[in-house]
């Protein structure tokens, strides 16, 4: 009997391991993407326009991938239309919109810390409405990860917080939680690539109305910019940086996150995704020469410990 149980548990354990690997790769790519985007924004391209280009480029890329691989996967049933539109709006477009609005009024670290309340909201939702048993280790991992993020942004330094900025960041946390929960539901009915293709399609529609594409400052992407920091002697055209943001900063990591939800719960995916600010901070220090104190390094270690703790809660 025990041998049969072990045999059945092995595929599940392998699936969870694969799921965590997908999230960690995605979080790493998102973290690197922060520095790439910062260099792209130094060209004068606004953060909202970069987000618009990110969504449109990812939409085109993902649609082409699905059309080549399995055109039938793009079939859209009438009863899916509203669900996918909501996913594209809340799960893709609004996460970026409210995050960018928040960082106009708050330090990036503070905004990111508030946004990563999202996994805590997922855990609360799972416990209160999803009738999902959330293990004590998961709650401990959430507390540990938020503590680590607080250390990384050195929250105790007495920063005066802008009320509207905090409100935007809190909305960003809510829509980030919605993204995880909506994606966890939708992957039961379609593959991760076609799901993200439709998600970015509806996000692109949103940006088309919010910022018409015909007013996009296309001339800016032809400019060449310095890579700054330790790579200041190197220059790349802005379009190459935008291409990175689209492919390795959007298509690949978003698809990996959604694919991981087939194997790992949204709560645990959210915790593992907290690797993003750790990677973002380290890359910015190594590349852009942004300062990194011993306390921030300790905070990064605490977040990594939280991710490992969540992984052990089976």
Predicted regions and their residues:
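Hydrophobic/aromatic residues within transmembrane alpha-helices
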Residues: 40, 50, 54, 102, ...
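Glycine-/small-residue-enriched transmembrane alpha-helix faces in small-molecule transporters
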Residues: 2-53, 158-185, 206-209
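C-terminal-most transmembrane helix of multi-pass membrane proteins
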Residues: 2-12, 55, 154-155, 238-240, ...
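Juxtamembrane helix-entry segments on the extracytoplasmic side of multipass membrane proteins
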Residues: 14-19, 44-52, 76-82, 154-175, ...
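Helix-helix packing/entry segments at the starts of transmembrane helices
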Residues: 52-53, 96, 110-117, 182-205, ...
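Hydrophobic transmembrane alpha-helices of multi-pass small-molecule transport proteins
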Residues: 62, 125, 134-155, 173, ...
